[in-house]
């Protein structure tokens, strides 16, 4: 049974993070972890995983609009393998198509004064997690 979940919106410069619960099917943005050419600040990610202690980690898989792999897809898959090995949790990949667009739309809907990349990336992780929870 799933307990708490963490979702990750993988990116080359930033990694958005959200947490959620299957019982309530809700997701909450946690924030972002800086990445350097796709390599995350593992110390910061370690702290988040330790604090939230998720049973499963959901990682957005960047595919194009026709569901074909892109240049960043392989990097995201490699990242997912590293996450699974590092944290010994079940890792699930889900198509993250339009998650950033949805995050921007949500921020505009609530009239967020500053649509920052940090907010967008963390909210995109929420969209990824909500999508995964609705399908599982």
Swiss-Prot record:
InterPro entries: RNaseH-like_sf (IPR012337), YqgF (IPR005227), YqgF/RNaseH-like_dom (IPR006641), YqgF/RNaseH-like_dom_sf (IPR037027). SMART domains: YqgFc. Its main location: cytoplasm. It is an enzyme of class 3 (hydrolase). Its EC number is 3.1.-.-. GO terms for biological process: rRNA 5'-end processing. The keyword Nuclease applies. GO terms for molecular function: nuclease activity. One of its GO terms (cellular component) is cytosol. Belongs to the YqgF nuclease family. NCBIfam families: RNAse_H_YqgF. This is Putative pre-16S rRNA nuclease. The lineage of its organism: Bacteria, Pseudomonadati, Pseudomonadota, Gammaproteobacteria, Thiotrichales.
């Amino acid at each position: 049974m799933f307990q708490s979940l963490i979702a990750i919106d993988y990116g080359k410069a930033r990694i958005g993070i959200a947490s959620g619960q299957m019982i309530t099917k809700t997701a909450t943005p946690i924030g972002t972890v800086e990445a350097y050419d796709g390599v995350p600040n593992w110390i910061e990610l370690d702290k988040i995983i330790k604090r939230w202690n998720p049973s499963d980690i959901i990682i957005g898989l960047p595919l194009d609009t026709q569901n074909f792999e892109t240049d960043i897809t392989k990097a995201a898959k490699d990242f997912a393998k590293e996450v699974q090995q590092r944290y010994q949790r079940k890792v699930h990949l889900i198509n993250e198509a339009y998650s950033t667009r949805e995050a921007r739309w949500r921020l505009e809907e609530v009239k967020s004064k500053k649509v920052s990349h940090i907010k967008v990336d963390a909210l995109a992780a929420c969209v990824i997690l909500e999508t995964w929870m609705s399908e599982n």
